[in-house]
Amino acid sequence: MNNICKLNKFIISKSSSSLSSTSSKIKTNCLIKNAKMFSSSLNLNRFYSTNNTNNNKLKKPLSIGQATFETHPYLLDKNEITKGIKMKEFKDRREKLMKNFPIGSVVVIFTPPEPMMSYDIPWSFRQNTNFNYLTGFNEPEAVLVLVKTSELDHQSYLFVRERNEEKEKWDGARCGGENVKKYFGIDFGYNLTNRDIPILGKLLKSTTDGKLYCNTTPWNQLSNKLEPFLENIKFYTVESLLQQIRLIKSDAEIKMMLKSGEIAGTSFHETMKYTGTKSSSSSSSSSSSPLNEYQVSAYFEWCVKDKGAQRMSYPPVVAGGDNGHTLHYIQNNQLLNYCDLLLMDAGCEYWGYTSDITRTFPVSGKFTEAQSEVYQAVLDVNKKCIELCKPGETINSIHLKSVELIQAHLKRLGIINESNPNDYRLYYPHSIGHYLGMDTHDTLDFDYGVTLEPGMIITIEPGIYISKYDSNVPEKYRGISIRVEDDVVIPNLNNSPLVLTHLAPKEISEIESIMSNK
C-alpha cells in the first residue's frame, strides 16, 4: 500500500506510552542537525512586508478576512485575536498541547476547503474547532504545524491561502502568509503555493521519530502535493489530547460561554413573549392564521443574531404538541395547537462558544393543571441535578440521581407502577446531559464517567415525554412532552454551580407572566 493510501485511511493509534520513551532517545546532535536544516533548506528566515506598496490607492486599514482591532475596534480589544480571547491565551494553548510530546515531534492541524452547498455556492463557513482553538484563524484551507524544539519550547508555522486581488474582489479579503505573525502570534507564515508547499513537506518530514500527530488528513489536492514527503511516516491522532485541554475552560472562555448563554436566555424570554402575543391574536380573530413552528424558530434566530451571535449552535427543535415526543425533531413546520405545549431546544454560537437551552411553554400562555404537574416534576429534577454539579461528581452519577427522581415522579403521577420501575426509560430515554464548549456536544472522546473538575461545563436536561397515543398513561397526561435544560459551570470546591443560562425563564409563574405581557 503506498503512503498516500495510508494517509487517506489514516490508521489511528491512540497509544501515548511511546511518547516518554521516545523522548529519552533524542540526542543533542539531532537537534543541531535539525536546526541547520530549518535555517538552510527550509529558508525559515524569509519574511514578508505588510506595507501597502500600491501608490495608486488611498491608504486604508488592512483587512485580513476577519475582524481585527484595526478594522473592528468596537468588537475587539487591542490584544485580542477573537472576541474575549487574547493572543497570549492562544499561545498558551499551543504550549499546553506541545508539552505532551518529546523533542523533535511534529504536530499538524489541517482545516479543509470551504464546503459547498452546490457547484459554486458555499455553505456558511465554520472553522474546524481544534484549529480555531489553537489559532483563532478563520479561513478554510490552512495548515498549522508545531515543532517541538526543546523541553520548554516549540516553533509554530501557519500555511494559508495567498492573497489574490481578483479572488478577493469576489469572495472577500484573505490574510496571506505575510500577515500571520502580526495578527495571530505565529512564528512563521507561509502561503499554500507551489513555492511554499515544499517547505510544509520538509517540515512534516523533519519529525525525528517518523510520526506525525494530526487532527485529520489533508484535503485531496494538498495530499497529492505532500505525498513525496510522507514516505515511511506514520500518522497518529492528536484529537484526544486536544479535547483533554479543551475540557477545562479558562476564565476568559467561561465569560464567553456566559455571554452566549445570556444571549440565548434573553432570546427565549423574548420568544415566549412573541409566542404569547401571536397566539392570543390568532385565537381571538377568525381571520388570523395559527402560529407555525417555523415562525417561532425564525424569531428566536433573529433575536440571537440581533444580540451579536454569529449563528445557531445547532438546528433548533421547535416542537409543538406531540412533535416534542421526537427528541431531535427539526422539521419545525407544523401549525401550533392553542392548547398544546411548545418544546423548544435552541442555542447560539457567540464567537466560537455555544449555548444549549431547552424550555417548554404553553402556546396559549397558560399551563393546564396536567401540564403543570408534569412540568413541575421535570423542573424539580432540573434544579436538584444542578445542585449536584460539583467537583467529584460525574455526568453518570448525576444521571443516576436524575433517574431516581424521575422514577419517583412518574410513580406519583401514575404513569409507571412499582412493579415496573424500569419503564421510566419509555418516558426519559436519554442522559441527563453532556459536555459543552466550542461544540454543542463537546469533547466527545471523553465518556460520562470522567470526574468533574472546576472549569468544566455540562448541560443538565431532564425530560418526560408522553405520546398522545400511549394508552397506558392517564388520558390527561397524553401528548405532554417537557424538557428543561440549562448550561452549568462546575465550580471550585464549596462554591455553588454557575448557571450560564439563568436568563431563560423556567418558573411557571414567570413564563405565564411573560406570555400574557404582564
Curated annotation (Swiss-Prot):
Pfam families in the cross-refs: AMP_N, Peptidase_M24
Binding site for Mn(2+) 1: D356, H434, E461, E485
Uppermost EC category: hydrolase
Binding site for Mn(2+) 2: D345, D356, E485
Co-factor: note: Binds 2 manganese ions per subunit.
Keywords associated with the record: Aminopeptidase, Cytoplasm, Hydrolase, Manganese, Metal-binding, Metalloprotease, Mitochondrion, Protease, Transit peptide
GO process terms (BP): proteolysis
Range of the transit peptide: 1-48
Assembly information from the UniProt record: Homodimer.
Protein's UniProt name: Xaa-Pro aminopeptidase 3
